[in-house]
Amino acid sequence: MPRSLKKGPFIDFKLEKRILDLNAKDEKKVVKTWSRSSMISPDFVGHTIAVHNGKTHVPVYVSDNMVGHKLGEFAPTRTFRGHAGGKAEKGGSAPRKK
């Protein structure tokens, strides 16, 4: 169920303040955050935000298409190592009929 419109989007106060301070100074620094649930606002565009994935901080460069999404969507928390079982042989199947 989506968040109520009357509440507005959630953006971590400290994160928003740091981004607005950088915008006022025209600086581009990497900003570390643990707030994966913060919504990306138009003020964040052009900045690199290091989002914590549970182990490390993953640098995420914010572009125009990311506005409205959450920071955690761009920092995966799980590593896919492949399915169990032996490796499939290359070209081991029967030839296809046309």
Curated annotation (Swiss-Prot):
Position of the signal peptide: none
SUPFAM superfamilies: Ribosomal protein S19 (SSF54570)
Keywords: Ribonucleoprotein, Ribosomal protein, RNA-binding, rRNA-binding
Pfam families membership: Ribosomal_S19 (PF00203)
Region (Disordered): 77-98
Listed GO CC annotations: cytoplasm; small ribosomal subunit
Keyword check for DNA-binding: no
GO BP annotations listed: ribosomal small subunit assembly; translation
Keyword Ribosomal protein found: yes
Example GO molecular function: rRNA binding
Family assignment from sequence similarity: Belongs to the universal ribosomal protein uS19 family.
Reported function: Protein S19 forms a complex with S13 that binds strongly to the 16S ribosomal RNA.
Record protein name field: Small ribosomal subunit protein uS19
Originating organism: Chlorobium limicola (strain DSM 245 / NBRC 103803 / 6330)
Classification of source organism: Bacteria, Pseudomonadati, Chlorobiota, Chlorobiia, Chlorobiales
Gene symbol of the encoding locus: rpsS
